[in-house]
């Protein structure tokens, strides 16, 4: 009996640690075009200009700078090889329901309280960022990023998950 108790407590502990993990919220991202491709070299410099119109509390610009430094780029205040312009548009909560029915009666006698069929409900957060990267050696490239959670959760955890998706996407634009 003690093995079952041990295994059960292990799974409960694993579940609790997953629930407190900030990246546990499932999310995905899409770009408005094919993306940005920047051939860069180690020790090149970057500057981030961050605009937060929604007045959202965020550390997106600092976390992005840290990730870029970990890639081997260096942050400067002036005369940078890459100027990254970020405009954080907003973070919104979306909720809607849609009736799904298997009844043929639905098509000729619409009754929203009909018991046949099911309701599909979706709840999620989105975060939109407009991005432009200016380079000394190449043309400027721009895109819009829209990150979306798979479901609702704690707002702070959802925001952190969306920001991580956006940061990882921006970092993926740089290749060495």
Language-model region placement:
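Sec-dependent bacterial lipoprotein signal peptides
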Residues: 1-19
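Residues embedded in well-ordered secondary-structure elements
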Residues: 8, 37, 75, 118-122
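A structural "domain/chain start" motif
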Residues: 16-73, 91, 175-176
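Solvent-exposed loop and beta-edge segments used for protein-protein assembly and interaction
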Residues: 40-42, 78, 123-125
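Second-shell loop/turn segments in exported
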Residues: 48-55, 117, 148-157
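Short acidic low-complexity segments
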Residues: 71-83
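Surface-exposed short loop/turn segments
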Residues: 82-152
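C-terminal partner/receptor-binding element of secreted or periplasmic proteins
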Residues: 149-176
């Amino acid at each position: 009996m003690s093995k079952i108790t041990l295994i059960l407590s292990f799974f409960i502990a694993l579940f609790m640690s997953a629930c407190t993990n900030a990246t546990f919220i499932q999310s995905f991202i899409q770009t408005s075009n094919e993306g940005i491709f920047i051939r860069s070299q180690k020790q090149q410099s970057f500057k981030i200009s961050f605009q937060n119109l929604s007045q959202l509390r965020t550390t997106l610009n600092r976390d992005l700078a840290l990730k870029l430094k970990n890639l081997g780029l260096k942050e400067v205040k002036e005369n940078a090889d890459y100027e990254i312009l970020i405009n954080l548009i907003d973070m919104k909560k979306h909720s809607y329901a849609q009736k799904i029915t298997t009844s043929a009666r639905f098509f000729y006698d619409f009754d929203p309280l009909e018991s046949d069929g099911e309701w599909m409900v979706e709840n999620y957060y989105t975060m939109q960022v407009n991005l432009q990267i200016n380079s000394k050696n190449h043309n400027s490239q721009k895109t819009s990023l829209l990150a979306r959670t798979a479901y609702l959760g704690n707002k702070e955890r959802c925001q952190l998950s969306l920001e991580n998706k956006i940061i990882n996407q921006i970092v993926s634009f740089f290749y060495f």
